[in-house]
Amino acid sequence: MTSTPLPLLYSYRRCPYAMRARMALLVAGIAFDAHDIVLRDKPAAMLALSPKGTVPVLVLPDGTVLEQSLDIMQWAWHQHDPAGWWARAQSADNQALLAVCDGAFKHQLDRYKYPERFDDVEHRAQPRDAAVEALLAPLDAQLQRHGQLGGETPCATDLAVFPFVRQFAAVEPGWFASLPLPALQAWLAGWLAHPLFETAMAKLPSGQTVRFAAW
């Protein structure tokens, strides 16, 4: 008797886009195989399916290839979402936050985290402060009202935004902790300590495929 093939996720542990995809698949209760790539030696099979060469890439059992993290999240919750994670993320406020996260905030985050790539090490504070203004301050204001972006319980937007806030906070942890953004800091701490995050961040053997059971 042959086992039913599972979706195959090409991933990279620390990539925030891959992180959001892994968490969505886990929340949706979807078992999947994960292949943690080696950045300097990307799998030929992945490049044949997705020549852009970035992760995440999800290959479905029928051969369909999803190359964008938000498409993977949407697909996962369209399979199983009794708690309404995806539906509750469709509010105007959440859509606006997500657009800023993946647009203006990510632009500034890259320049803050990797100033040497942009020949602007001396002016690192400028993109840092712009990132706070673009996303973190509005995010804190929204979290003050409910605690999660889905209201009293989280939604897809929480999982989509969290990995990028985590990345920002890790650049200068002491400075981030000093910001007057208590709701955001509590929200981030909660997700960092969440069993979902622990499962999604399990260290996998590089270049090998490991099965994630339905969570």
Features from the language model and the residues they span:
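Catalytic cores of nucleotide-enabled group-transfer and carboxylate-activating enzymes in metabolic
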Residues: 35, 43, 138-144, 162-169, ...
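Surface-exposed helix-capping loop/turn segments at secondary-structure junctions
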Residues: 141-152, 196-200
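Acidic, serine/threonine/proline-rich low-complexity intrinsically disordered regions
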Residues: 123-124, 173-179
